[in-house]
């Protein structure tokens, strides 16, 4: 039997609030090994919520609701569920006292409207809310239907899920075998190209392998259902090892690894330092490098040489080359990388110069054209040309440029290690 998530709130339908609750609960259900095939978002409307319940009860055995537990007239979840199952509500004096105590602790008197939060269907149990005033409930109105309700505030919902809902579900026999996943991360290769290399693994049933793509990055999820992490790793790790061998340098990390953190560890391990010279990214590369705590161990700093005069004055870029080839050129990227490496006395120097748009492009130098220079400790400089696409927006081109530059450094550090 499966679970279904029903998120209540007109603000979700209007896009005023991002529905992070559904994502969190979906991940949690997967961890518990509870099948989950449907999600529904319903506005604050009694009849539409009843229709959603009617559909859900026919195809799912655990109905998880978020939102609509507040004190205002449009908070209708509890009474609508009770009415659907033709059950009357009761006022729980203990819960009412707890709500009043929370207001008292804040030096406030409880508004009369909050008393509705102490209402619960006959036969249901409250899910305590340690931080907010809206408790949830656990209720089995029918033999094959279990209902759990949570407030829409994510922090409150998450704590209630962990402290009360998970123990309850486990006590009912759910979660004996959980789904364990490992995410392998790749850069410098597209989703389709990577999929072709590991196509034979997509037919596996234990573990399963599935690709996911995001901006400039591809992930492969390796998942299995097992009674313990140790048992899961015995199934996952051989497949992960095979994929890493196939991918080679395109593989950069797993699970919570980030590219800036991986590059930082490589620099720290090799006792080397880095500086950057940026034009079109405007400091974006330096920003992602310094997201990592302790990055001062290996990051010397950067020069944002947006103006050509700064390129000449601080990076020793040849003014004649700027005039002849333009700021967006391989020769200028080369000189920028060498210039910042020398100026800040670091082992490595990275440069980025390009056209992020939306204007400034031409037939020969379109928007999305970016040159990335990399100066090595030996004094060698390599420059790569990239065309990130005229149809991409400015922010995307800047982000891809910064991460591509960092990935170029990662590959060189691995080759030299």
Curated annotation (Swiss-Prot):
Top-level taxon of origin: Bacteria
Organism: Microcystis aeruginosa (strain NIES-843 / IAM M-2473)
InterPro entries named in the record: CinA, CinA-like_C, CinA_C, CinA_KH, Competence-induced_CinA, MoaB/Mog-like_dom_sf, MoaB/Mog_dom
Protein name: CinA-like protein
Family listed: Belongs to the CinA family.
